[in-house]
Structure formats: structure tokens, C-alpha cells
């Protein structure tokens, strides 16, 4: 403080000397300097406490806002880490659901294919059975038709042959032999 007063006094003295004695006298300048110092001293004495309190309040509010900002930053960091963790969990669940959906689709596909194959096998078996039944019917009908035709042809041939006298004689002889054998038997 003393250095400041000395500096101000010297500066004002040199400024007065450089003016060419047209300004204030050094005594007046010193008196004005002392008045200013007294004013500053009174302001310091009476304003020290309120100014100090104002600076302390300002400092405390800055510190408090920094602490609050740091606390909010830490809370935001925690929320961010929780959100990242939830995002990772959601991604894992989505992958699991996708995998499960694919597995379910594959299982359903296999079931549908197996069912279709079973139905196809049953249809083939039924078709074979139907074909066999129809084939047997056709064989029987063909055999009956063949027997009927053979019978008709045989009758026609027999009728033609019976028209011959030699055949009639042989037939009568054979019938007579049969009758004799029956009598004897």
C-alpha cells in the first residue's frame, strides 16, 4: 500500500513538473491524493464486510453451481451407462428373439414338410390300394369275359362238331360207357 502511495505521489509530481507551472501545486496534488486515499480507506473500512460477503456469496454460488454441475454430470454419466446397458440388453434380446423366430420357423417348416410327406405317402398307399383293387376287378372281369368267350367259342365249336355224325357216335358211345360204369359201380 505504501508503494502505491509513493508511486502516485511521484507520478503526480513529475506530471506537475512537466506542465510548466500552469497546473496545481505539488502540495495541492498531495492533498488531493491524501483525500482520495482517505476516501478509499473509508470505503474499505465500511465496505469490507459487504464486499467480502458479496465476493464470498459469489464464490460460494460459483462453487455450488460447479458442484451441482459435476453432480448432474455424474448423474448423466450414470444414466448414459444405464441407457447403454439397456441398449445392449435390448440388442441381445432382439438377437435372441430373432434366433428363436428362425428356429421356430425352421421347426414349423420341418413339421409342415413332414406332414406333407406323410399325407403324400398316405395318398400313394391309397392310390396303390385303389389301383390293386381296380386291377383285381379288371382281372376278374377280364377272366370272366375270357371264360364267357371261351365258353361261347367252345359251344360254337361243339355245335359244329356235333353236327358231324362221327362225333355224335363217339359221344353216344362215351355216354353209354359212363352209364354202364355207374351201374356196375
Swiss-Prot record:
<keyword id="KW-0375">Hydrogen ion transport</keyword>
<keyword id="KW-1003">Cell membrane</keyword>
<dbReference type="GO" id="GO:0005886">
    <property type="term" value="C:plasma membrane"/>
</dbReference>
<feature type="transmembrane region" description="Helical">
    <location>
        <begin position="27"/>
        <end position="47"/>
    </location>
</feature>
<comment type="function">
    <text>F(1)F(0) ATP synthase produces ATP from ADP in the presence of a proton or sodium gradient. F-type ATPases consist of two structural domains, F(1) containing the extramembraneous catalytic core and F(0) containing the membrane proton channel, linked together by a central stalk and a peripheral stalk. During catalysis, ATP synthesis in the catalytic domain of F(1) is coupled via a rotary mechanism of the central stalk subunits to proton translocation.</text>
</comment>
<comment type="function">
    <text>Component of the F(0) channel, it forms part of the peripheral stalk, linking F(1) to F(0).</text>
</comment>
<dbReference type="InterPro" id="IPR002146">
    <property type="entry name" value="ATP_synth_b/b'su_bac/chlpt"/>
</dbReference>
<keyword id="KW-1133">Transmembrane helix</keyword>
<comment type="similarity">
    <text>Belongs to the ATPase B chain family.</text>
</comment>
<keyword id="KW-0406">Ion transport</keyword>
<keyword id="KW-0472">Membrane</keyword>
<protein>
    <recommendedName>
        <fullName>ATP synthase subunit b</fullName>
    </recommendedName>
</protein>
<keyword id="KW-0813">Transport</keyword>
<keyword id="KW-0138">CF(0)</keyword>
<keyword id="KW-0066">ATP synthesis</keyword>
<keyword id="KW-0997">Cell inner membrane</keyword>
<dbReference type="GO" id="GO:0046933">
    <property type="term" value="F:proton-transporting ATP synthase activity, rotational mechanism"/>
</dbReference>
<comment type="subunit">
    <text>F-type ATPases have 2 components, F(1) - the catalytic core - and F(0) - the membrane proton channel. F(1) has five subunits: alpha(3), beta(3), gamma(1), delta(1), epsilon(1). F(0) has three main subunits: a(1), b(2) and c(10-14). The alpha and beta chains form an alternating ring which encloses part of the gamma chain. F(1) is attached to F(0) by a central stalk formed by the gamma and epsilon chains, while a peripheral stalk is formed by the delta and b chains.</text>
</comment>
<dbReference type="GO" id="GO:0045259">
    <property type="term" value="C:proton-transporting ATP synthase complex"/>
</dbReference>
<keyword id="KW-0812">Transmembrane</keyword>
<dbReference type="Pfam" id="PF00430">
    <property type="entry name" value="ATP-synt_B"/>
</dbReference>
Amino acid at each position: 500500500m505504501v508503494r502505491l502511495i509513493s508511486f502516485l505521489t511521484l507520478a503526480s509530481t513529475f506530471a506537475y513538473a512537466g506542465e510548466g507551472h500552469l497546473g496545481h501545486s505539488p502540495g495541492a496534488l498531495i492533498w488531493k491524493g491524501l483525500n482520495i486515499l482517505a476516501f478509499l480507506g473509508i470505503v474499505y473500512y465500511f465496505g469490507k464486510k459487504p464486499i467480502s460477503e458479496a465476493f464470498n456469496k459469489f464464490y460460494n454460488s460459483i462453487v455450488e453451481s460447479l458442484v451441482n454441475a459435476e453432480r448432474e454430470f455424474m448423474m448423466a454419466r450414470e444414466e448414459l451407462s444405464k441407457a447403454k446397458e439397456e441398449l445392449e440388453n435390448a440388442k441381445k434380446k432382439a438377437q435372441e428373439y430373432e434366433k428363436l423366430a428362425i428356429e421356430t420357423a425352421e421347426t414349423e417348416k420341418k413339421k409342415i414338410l413332414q406332414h406333407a410327406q406323410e399325407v403324400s405317402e398316405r395318398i400313394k398307399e391309397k392310390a396303390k390300394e385303389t389301383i390293386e383293387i381296380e386291377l383285381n376287378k379288371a382281372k376278374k372281369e377280364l377272366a370272366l369275359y375270357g371264360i364267357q368267350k371261351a365258353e361261347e367259342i367252345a359251344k360254337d365249336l361243339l355245335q359244329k362238331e356235333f353236327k358231324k355224325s362221327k362225333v355224335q357216335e363217339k359221344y353216344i358211345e362215351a355216354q353209354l360207357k359212363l352209364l354202364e360204369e355207374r351201374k356196375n359201380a
